[in-house]
């Protein structure tokens, strides 16, 4: 029989979608239960530990944080731009992990010290857009991601000026990405940067602000229906045909979007047959303690299943009730019980 996968329309989803905040990382209606449930959770503790480290390390301006030693030696403008993007991404990605930890630490405790450090840090980061050292679409999408998380997570504590700062950045950066996607993305087989990161980030920005800025209604319609019609994979067999190293970069999108859509709609987006097929790809492409199977560029760097891959398999085991993914995780954790903690990232 042909598997049935028929998600609800966006109109039905939005009819039940809450107007309060937070509503993206968690629903405010479940907030106290989530805090209680995670009181002794080691993953929750990891976020709080990372957030505390941020508080003890004040952030400087980008020009003081970035290493331009190699950049200034290059005379070719293309090489300089590439090196600048690479070096600035190191700082911006680090700060995404920091801000995300601060937002989550606040949501897990309601301790306002995490909000204060988070908004101060993010205000500085957003000012980097005027710096000559800031470049690249990944960096810009990361600012959108941080602004969205802070807006939704800290909403009840934000001053009017802070809300406006975040909304202005969400509107401007979000519109930039939306206008790059529309009539382009849906007509291509794949667009790696979009599928890896920026599409997920725009989706969360849309649902964080829908009903509050007019642009978000358009983004929400586009992102929800694009996912249903095109994603998660390029083929139904569950394989990641554009390379295993590229698969790793897509892991957050492949879990976070369907998990979010499932929560707000009541429909199981992991029921898409692609996910159970993909569990087999994860296992066969890189068995426990094995190198990657050699598919695609940069596969040589995948020397053993890392924390991100094992964490992804763990999510599939839970969301799809997949015994093969569960066995894969169990086998690896027998030898490396801390493997999931190594997946800690923004």
Where do the PLM segments sit?
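Carbohydrate-active enzyme catalytic cores, enriched for enzymes
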Residues: 209, 249-346
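Low-complexity, intrinsically disordered/propeptide-like segments
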Residues: 13, 17, 28, 62-65, ...
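Aromatic-lined, polymer-binding surfaces characteristic
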Residues: 23, 38, 44-50, 55-291
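Intrinsically disordered, low-complexity segments enriched in polar/charged residues with Gly/Pro
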Residues: 9-12, 93, 279, 302-304
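Short amphipathic alpha-helical segments that mediate assembly, nucleic-acid/protein binding
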Residues: 6-10, 31, 44, 163, ...
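Mature N-terminal, pre-catalytic/accessory segment of carbohydrate-active enzymes
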Residues: 1-49
């Amino acid at each position: 029989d042909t598997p049935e996968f028929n998600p609800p329309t966006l109109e039905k989803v939005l009819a039940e979608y809450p107007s309060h905040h937070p509503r993206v990382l968690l629903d405010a209606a479940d907030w106290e239960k989530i805090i209680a449930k995670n009181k002794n959770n080691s993953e929750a503790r990891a976020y709080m530990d990372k957030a505390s480290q941020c508080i003890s390390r004040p952030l400087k301006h980008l020009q003081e944080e970035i290493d331009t030693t190699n950049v200034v030696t290059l005379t070719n403008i293309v090489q300089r731009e590439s090196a600048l993007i690479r070096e600035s991404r190191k700082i911006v990605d680090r700060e995404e992990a920091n801000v995300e930890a601060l937002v989550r630490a606040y949501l897990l405790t309601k301790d306002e010290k995490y909000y204060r450090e988070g908004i101060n840090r993010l205000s500085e980061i957003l000012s980097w857009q005027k710096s000559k050292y800031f470049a690249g679409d990944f960096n810009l999408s990361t600012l959108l991601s941080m602004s969205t998380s802070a807006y939704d997570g800290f909403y009840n504590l934000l001053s009017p000026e802070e809300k406006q700062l975040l909304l202005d950045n969400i509107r401007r950066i979000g519109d930039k990405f939306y206008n790059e996607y529309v009539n382009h993305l849906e007509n291509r087989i794949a667009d790696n940067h979009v599928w890896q990161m920026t599409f997920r980030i725009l989706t969360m920005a849309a649902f964080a602000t829908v009903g509050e800025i007019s642009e978000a209604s358009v983004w929400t319609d586009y992102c929800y229906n694009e996912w249903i019609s095109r994603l998660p994979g390029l083929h139904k067999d569950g394989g990641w045909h554009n390379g295993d190293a590229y698969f790793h970069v897509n892991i957050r999108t492949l879990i976070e979007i369907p998990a979010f859509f499932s929560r707000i709609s009541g429909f199981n987006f992991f029921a898409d047959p692609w996910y159970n097929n993909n569990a087999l790809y994860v296992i066969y492409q890189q068995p426990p303690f094995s190198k990657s199977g050699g598919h695609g560029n940069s596969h040589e760097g995948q020397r053993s299943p890392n924390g991100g891959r094992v964490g992804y398999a763990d999510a599939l085991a839970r969301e799809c009730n997949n015994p093969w993914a569960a066995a894969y995780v169990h086998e690896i954790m027998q030898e490396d019980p801390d493997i999931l903690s190594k997946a800690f990232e923004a």
